[in-house]
Amino acid sequence: ENNVLLKEKTGEDIAVKRILDLREFPGTEWESLLVHDIKEIIEDKEIDVVVETMGGTSPAFEFVRDALLSGKHVTTSNKALVAAHGTELLKIAREKNVNFFFEASVGGGIPIIRTLTESYAGEHFKEITGILNGTTNYILTKMDAEGESFEKALATAQDLGYAERNPEADVEGHDTCRKIAILSSLATGKEVNFENIHTEGITKI
């Protein structure tokens, strides 16, 4: 259904040609698409766009870098990758005249990155504030509105699937830190290293 709409709007017939995974999925509809070596994707001239869904910075960075260098467009929601290597990857994309899209790395479905880079391209920013992490927003709301303890609110968030089993990235502020680094870099036009941002979690509230 989505593919039909995309073809109507773009004129392009979009199809998945390869899926990179170390695992095997025998008997599945995508079994024939699986490859275990990134080179099979990088060297395939018929593949125009690479979607990175691995997470983390390595080997995601190396794979994305090589895809851009080979002239392929790349899209990702990997905030850790963008926060650590976004400037370098954008530079490569510009040099190769391809797109490196990472809208989904901050704000989910909110088009905040495109808004910053396009709608407010001529503006000067003094401050960026906002709720950048849904898990901590849920926990703090439960604590404030219903008087729940941090531990109970976190457990509820995990049961509902809002929080990971290992919630450290969210509750210690690492996720938000990476997101604000990305937004700050885009707003100021300067590389902001997430490791230089003072970060506090919510575990002691």
Segments and roles (model prediction):
Residues M54, P59-S70, S77-E118:
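Rossmann-fold NAD(P)-binding glycine/threonine-rich loop
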Residues F125-T136, H198:
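NAD(P)-dependent dehydrogenases' Rossmann-like dinucleotide-binding region
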Residues I112-F125, T136-E151, R178-V192:
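Oxidoreductase and adenylate-handling cofactor-binding alpha/beta cores
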